[in-house]
Structures are given as structure tokens and as C-alpha cells.
Regions:
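Ankyrin-repeat boundary/"N-cap" motif
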Residues: 33-45, 68-77, 101-129, 150-162, ...
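Positively charged n-region of N-terminal signal peptides that target proteins for export
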Residues: 1-4
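Ankyrin-repeat intra-repeat helix-capping/turn positions
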Residues: 50, 83, 132-133, 164-166, ...
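N-terminal segments that cap or nucleate solenoid repeat domains
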Residues: 24-71
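C-terminal motif of bacterial Sec signal peptides marking the signal peptidase cleavage site
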Residues: 15-16
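Sec-dependent N-terminal signal peptides
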Residues: 6-9
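Conserved ankyrin/ankyrin-like repeat signature
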Residues: 54, 86-87, 136-137, 166-170, ...
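Ankyrin repeat domain, specifically the short helix-to-loop turn at the C-terminus of the second helix
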Residues: 56-64, 89-97, 139-147, 172-180, ...
Length: 215
């Protein structure tokens, strides 16, 4: 009976985790938004529709997996937007570089019409650190060479800090992979930023991980 109850509780916990991630899951834009035509549209469509056979065929035909589309996005980043772990792994196994920046407008059509629009400049690891993603995405990217200390991009630490459910797990893992907690592009290390907003529990947690409040 105890075994049955334990299994039921484990199942409930797993279901709850899935609900949390589904709640925050972004609907990926349709392929043509960032991959308007040609071979890049074919590849993005295969990713969007989760067609690994079509993706393998295009890889075999020589598609450049590190191509940045006319809309400013890599195939790997687009697979991440689709929450497609298996496709990401397929791309990485065949040479996709997780450290290439994607630089794209939030709404390209608005930008084309002359309206003001935010431009994103990010790597896959930075985006995978956010609350929308299970830690397995970060682990996959790091396994295939994602740089936890990339100084050309906003670091993954900032997304992890905003993840109230799994942020600490992500931060601990990043530190285990060599993350420099004391570096910041803005000059304000994460621990100081958390102190400024009175997040003392997080300050103590970062200190336990090795962050230096005097850095």
C-alpha cells in the first residue's frame, strides 16, 4: 500500500511540473515570420511541424545548420522556441553551434512598417535559463558546448534568477559548469543586484555558491 501511495505522489509531482512548464510555454511564431523563403523556410517548417525525417534529409543535402535567417534567427534557437528537445539534440549532434547569437525583432511586421519594436539579441543558453524551460534544455546546450561565461551576451544567470520555481537548481548547475557569479556586463554582479531589491534569501544562496559581495 505504501508503495502505491509513493508512486501516486511521484506521478502527481511529475504532472504538476508539466503543468507549470505548459503554463509558461510560449507559442512559437510560424516559420515564415523569421524564415521567409527558400531553404531556410523548408528547414524551419520541418522544425515547427516536428518532422525529424525531413530535417535529416535537409542535413544530408548540406543545409547550413548555423545559418542565421533573414529574420535573424538560428534553427537551433527556433527549435528551442518550439520546446522541441529532440530536434535540438538532432541539430546539435550534427554540428549546430549553441553560441551563435540570434538577433531578431519581436514583431518583424511592425518593424517593416516603421513602428518601434524591441530587438532581441540572445544565445540559446540565455533563453533556456528562463522559467519557461525545464533545466534539461540548459544541460543539453552545455553538453554540446554552450558557453556559460559568454561575455558577448546576457548571461544565463539573469533568467535563472527570475525562475522562482527552478531557478536555484539552475544556478547551482551553472556554477557546477564553471559559471563566474561575479561577472556582469553592466558592472553590477548578480549578488549586488539581488541585494538592491532586498532578496536576502537569494543573496545568501549566491554567497553559498561562491559569489563575492565585494567583487
Amino acid at each position: 500500500m505504501k508503495k502505491f501511495v509513493a508512486l501516486a505522489l511521484i506521478s502527481l509531482c511529475l504532472s504538476s511540473c508539466n503543468l507549470i512548464f505548459n503554463r509558461y510555454k510560449h507559442s512559437a511564431p510560424k516559420p515564415e515570420v523569421y524564415f521567409p523563403d527558400g531553404l531556410e523556410l523548408q528547414m524551419a517548417t520541418a522544425i515547427y511541424n516536428d518532422k525529424p525525417r525531413a530535417i535529416r534529409k535537409l542535413i544530408k543535402e548540406g543545409v547550413d545548420l548555423n545559418h542565421v535567417s533573414k529574420g535573424g534567427m538560428t534553427y537551433l534557437y527556433y527549435a528551442l522556441l518550439n520546446h522541441n528537445y529532440d530536434v535540438m539534440e538532432l541539430l546539435l549532434k550534427h554540428g549546430a553551434d549553441p553560441n551563435i547569437h540570434s538577433e531578431f525583432y519581436t514583431n518583424p511586421e511592425y518593424h517593416k512598417r516603421g513602428y518601434s519594436d524591441d530587438q532581441t539579441d540572445a544565445t540559446c543558453l540565455e533563453y533556456a535559463s528562463h522559467k519557461y524551460f525545464d533545466i534539461k534544455y540548459m544541460k543539453l546546450l552545455i553538453k554540446y558546448g554552450a558557453n556559460v561565461n559568454d561575455t558577448t551576451s546576457i548571461g544565463p544567470i539573469w533568467g535563472a534568477l527570475r525562475d522562482e520555481s527552478h531557478g536555484r537548481e539552475k544556478l547551482k548547475y551553472l556554477v557546477e559548469q564553471g559559471l563566474n557569479l561575479n561577472y556582469s556586463q553592466t558592472g553590477t554582479p548578480a549578488i549586488c543586484g539581488q541585494a538592491l531589491i532586498y532578496e536576502w534569501d537569494m543573496v545568501l544562496f549566491l554567497m553559498d555558491l561562491g559569489a563575492d559581495p565585494l567583487a
